Amino acid sequence: MVKVITYGTYDLLHFGHIRLLERAKALGDYLIVGVTSDDYDKTRGKINNQQSLMERVAAIKATGLADEIIAEEYEGQKIDDIRRYDVDIFAIGSDWEGKFDYLNEYCTVVYLPRTEGVSSSEIRAQNRKLTIGAIGEGGLCKKFIREAEFVNGVEYKECDDTLEGVDAVYVASHPEKHYDDVKRALIADKHVICESPVAMSLAQYEELTDLAKEKSLVLVDGIKTAYSTAYSRLLVVAKSGRIGDIVSVDATCTSLAGEAGEEGADLSKKQNSICAWGPTAMLPIFQLLGTQYKSKTIVTKLLNDSLNFDAFTKVDFVYDKAVASIKVAKAAKAEGELIITGTKGYIYVPAPWWKTDYFEVRFEDPTMNKRHFYQLDGEGIRYEIVAFAKAVENKKGNYYISDAVSKAIINVIQSFSKRDYTRI
């Protein structure tokens, strides 16, 4: 019996995929189809898939062409599979010509003609056409515009104050302007992704979320860290009981960029420390320990009293069975690490932890320690855009950051704005 194996993502299974499977099937007696897993696709920079692994497997199974379907989960698996399944022929599309010649050492490699005029990328772009404009200036907007180019079906377009010609808006203006800018976009029937905090008060936030629901629009709290694979896996590991009960979460986010701490610096157009770094630092605390803390204490060192611009701020939270703290600064420097303390071990994320691509689970016995590595492209921004586009397409809200977490973040910032803090 001649065994043939082929691999692919098979997102939105189309005629080209089916023709390739038919040609592969004709090469032998038994066809094995390897389907790339969601995580493996991310490591290869493929972030645009619209279907999950199980949906793609089901579509291939429905064709009746595959005798066996397996998941491709890591680089180098093809050699292992060829050996494990005693494969005679490796078949792949001609667009990979020469790429897999090294497999000739293990079996016969055949490059099959590719069906012209059809591709998953084109289908994804047709199915999901979202034009996004931006409100704001500076590095955040530039990064967002650059990363949007990597997302199928999403196009950035310059827009004026009327917001005409776009379906959605990215808001990265000064936090004090977020409420007005988001409200203007929602009134104009535009979906919105806004850098956190979405508003400076709970009343403003609730008004905006109510308006979005009333108009069936998507309003997303934009914290890029929430969308990275490593960060989401970190949450799962922490909540799984692997390190025991969580008793403390400590997050530090600082930067000296922008010369905020220099004498005579114009701070009027800059974000203060609590707005620039607070949402990111508070994210793992509220996602791991919840939002129902017993008390919070804010201690700050101000750069400018009239602008309420903090050079450094520390916030401590007390829960029933845990504590947490954040340190944020734009005119002070500390190690930007995240430490989650448990009764059996702890999780350590090195600086800059908010660009999470690696974390360690550590124990008293170092032989039990485990390191986790995950691909991170574009600081998580392109994953954020993909999630936003899917939310708009499916008309569902943001499940990466819950409404309760967004409110808890704003509540702390609101307390700071009211000067409910101790000054040092």
Regions picked out by a protein language model, each given a short descriptive name:
Residues 134, 149-150, 168-171, 218, ...:
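C-terminal helix-rich "cap/oligomerization" subdomain common to oxidoreductases
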Residues 226-294:
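Predominantly a Rossmann-like dinucleotide-binding segment in NAD(P)-dependent oxidoreductases
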Residues 128-164:
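N-terminal Rossmann-like dinucleotide-binding module
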